[in-house]
A protein has these predicted regions:
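Transmembrane helix interruption/hinge and helix-loop junction motifs
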Residues: 1-3
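Cytosolic/stromal cytosol-facing helical appendages immediately following the last transmembrane segment
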Residues: 5, 11-116
Length: 116
């Protein structure tokens, strides 16, 4: 029993940190006068995949979560200007575990954002 709990805890922590990494990879908030700029749609990756949002309590609507932290998750909606992950969470988790693939895909997305 104890080994299962330890293993389950380890897997849960890894998944939590992977999702956090995926949602914020490569995105920066400017810091002027010692204060970070206000959070915008360009500071987290969103996902419009309905099945993923249903199964993760709207986890993919990450930008609005940061902009309206007290808003209940069923009321979160997709922001039109929000930047999109190139795939759903399942694919993104696998990609994050394969660094060469992750950097190949995501660094191009970030480079494209810098031209906007």
């Amino acid at each position: 029993g104890l080994i299962f709990v330890i293993f389950h805890s380890f897997v849960s922590i890894i998944l939590l940190e992977l999702v956090n990494y995926i949602q914020h990879y490569g995105l920066e908030r400017k810091k002027e006068n010692g204060r970070y700029e206000r959070f915008t749609d360009l500071h987290s990756w969103n996902s419009r995949h309905i099945s993923a949002n249903w199964s993760t309590f709207n986890l993919g609507l990450h930008a609005e979560h940061h902009q309206s932290a007290s808003k209940p998750y069923p009321l979160l909606s997709q922001e039109e200007k929000a930047i999109e992950m190139p795939a759903n969470y399942s694919i993104m988790l696998i990609m994050a575990l394969i660094p060469p693939l992750w950097f190949f895909v995501m660094d191009r997305k970030i480079d494209n954002l810098k031209t906007i």
